[in-house]
Structure formats: C-alpha cells, structure tokens
C-alpha cells in the first residue's frame, strides 16, 4: 500500500493531453502535482468537481501545483465529457485526465474501494521531488471541497519552506489566528532556546511544547 512519505511510482499513462510519464512530467519542471481520481465520467457529483476545480485552476498554479485527474473510463469518454462540460457549462477543462481503463494505476495507489470496480474520490499531493506529501479520500457520494485542498497545498508548501507546522483551520485558527506553530522542542537545549526566543518576543508560547509565531 502506498503511504505518505513514499516516492510516487514511476508510470507511463495515457491522458487527454497524450502520453505522460509520472512523476517526471511535473518534477522535471520543478512542479508539484495533484493526482485526483473520480468515480466516473458523465456523473453529477464528478461534473460539479471538475467545474469547481477548473475555475480554481489558476489558484493551484500560483502555488506551483498542477492537477491531473484519473478514472477507469477510456480516453474518448473523458474527451466527450469535457466537450459536454464546455458546451453546457461554459468551462473548458484545461488539466489532463488519465484514462486508467484497466485500473492498473488506481489499484497500485489504493484508489479502488473494497468490493468496487470504480475509483473513490482520492487526492494525492506529490512534491517536486516526487514524494507523496498528502493523501485524502472522499466517498463516491460526497464531492470534494477544492478550497480545503488548496489550503492543504498552501500549508504543505509553507511547512516545507519554513520548517513550521500549521494549526487547525489555518489561517483562521481559533487559538492563534494566522500564526504558525514552531516544532516542539525535542531536547533540553531546545527548550532553553524556546525560552530565549520567547523572552526576545520572537515567539509566543502556551507552554514549552506549544509555541507559535508570525509567518515570516
């Protein structure tokens, strides 16, 4: 089973944008990518998800993250569905969608629930080193909240770049607002360093193990 922290498997996939090699197609450009699966083309919940993602596409790209979809449908089904979305909803889907019609990649990534033949609503966030940083699953009957996924991606980027952790509902946390959490001290020396930083006003603390600061 694939888990967070592992290298994304090297695979060649057929998509609506042609054949793509993952993760190289994105990592060689220095980009992160978001692989997400949907149960099936021409279904209502999936249509709302594709519409919602497309109108937020630039927000993902501003963070250096490229979406790529996947289902066990064939590529011609993807293309016809996208034509329908453009014609009926006025939105052109710009990101590629994998035609995993044999389910090989979906099986490898654990996207197909027990007893099912179609993919769940899985999301894999993969960084520019090809490492899986987050995995999220939704059931078929509940559509994803792309704004929450955007928050997750932004938080992962900040954590990677700044070496901090992000609290519940960041940047609207009920305790510390938009501030970020300093990793807990893991030695007596680090506890002293936290105390010194607190005395200088560089961080705030509820206790030695719960310190936070403004995002720099």
UniProtKB/Swiss-Prot annotation:
Chemical reaction(s) catalysed: a hydroperoxide + [thioredoxin]-dithiol = an alcohol + [thioredoxin]-disulfide + H2O
GO biological process, alphabetically ordered: cell redox homeostasis; cellular response to stress; hydrogen peroxide catabolic process; response to oxidative stress
CDD domains xref list: PRX_1cys (cd03016)
InterPro entries named in the record: AhpC/TSA (IPR000866), Peroxiredoxin (IPR050217), Peroxiredoxin_AhpC-typ (IPR024706), Peroxiredoxin_C (IPR019479), Peroxiredoxin_TDXH (IPR022915), PRX_1cys (IPR045020), Thioredoxin-like_sf (IPR036249), Thioredoxin_domain (IPR013766)
Alphabetized UniProt keyword annotations: Antioxidant, Cytoplasm, Disulfide bond, Oxidoreductase, Peroxidase, Redox-active center
GO MF term (any one): thioredoxin peroxidase activity
Disulfide topology: 205-211
Main location group: cytoplasm
Active site: 46 (cysteine sulfenic acid (-soh) intermediate)
Subcellular location: Cytoplasm
Function recorded in the entry: Thiol-specific peroxidase that catalyzes the reduction of hydrogen peroxide and organic hydroperoxides to water and alcohols, respectively. Plays a role in cell protection against oxidative stress by detoxifying peroxides.
Further facts: The active site is a conserved redox-active cysteine residue, the peroxidatic cysteine (C(P)), which makes the nucleophilic attack on the peroxide substrate. The peroxide oxidizes the C(P)-SH to cysteine sulfenic acid (C(P)-SOH), which then reacts with another cysteine residue, the resolving cysteine (C(R)), to form a disulfide bridge. The disulfide is subsequently reduced by an appropriate electron donor to complete the catalytic cycle.
Assembly mode: Homodecamer. Pentamer of dimers that assemble into a ring structure.
Family, per entry: Belongs to the peroxiredoxin family. Prx6 subfamily.
Name of this protein: Peroxiredoxin
Organism whose genome encodes this protein: Pyrococcus furiosus (strain ATCC 43587 / DSM 3638 / JCM 8422 / Vc1)
């Amino acid at each position: 089973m694939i888990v967070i922290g592992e290298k994304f498997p090297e695979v060649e996939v057929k998509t609506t944008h042609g054949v793509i090699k993952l993760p190289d197609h994105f990592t060689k450009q220095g980009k992160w990518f978001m692989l997400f699966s949907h149960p099936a083309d021409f279904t209502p919940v999936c249509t709302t998800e594709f519409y919602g993602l497309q109108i937020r596409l630039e927000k993902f790209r501003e963070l250096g993250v490229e979406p790529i979809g996947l289902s066990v449908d064939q590529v011609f089904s993807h293309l016809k569905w996208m034509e329908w979305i453009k014609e009926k909803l006025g939105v052109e889907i710009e990101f590629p969608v994998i035609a995993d019609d044999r389910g090989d990649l979906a099986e490898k990534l654990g996207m197909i629930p027990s007893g099912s033949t179609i993919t769940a609503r899985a999301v894999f966030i993969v960084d520019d080193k090809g490492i899986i940083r987050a995995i999220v699953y939704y059931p078929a009957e509940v559509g994803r909240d792309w704004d929450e996924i955007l928050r997750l991606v932004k938080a992962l980027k900040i954590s990677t770049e700044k070496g901090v952790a992000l609290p519940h509902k960041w940047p609207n946390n009920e305790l510390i607002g938009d501030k970020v959490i300093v990793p807990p001290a893991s030695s007596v020396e680090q506890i002293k360093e936290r105390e010194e930083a607190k005395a200088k006003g560089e961080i705030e603390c509820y206790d030695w193990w719960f310190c936070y600061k403004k995002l720099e």
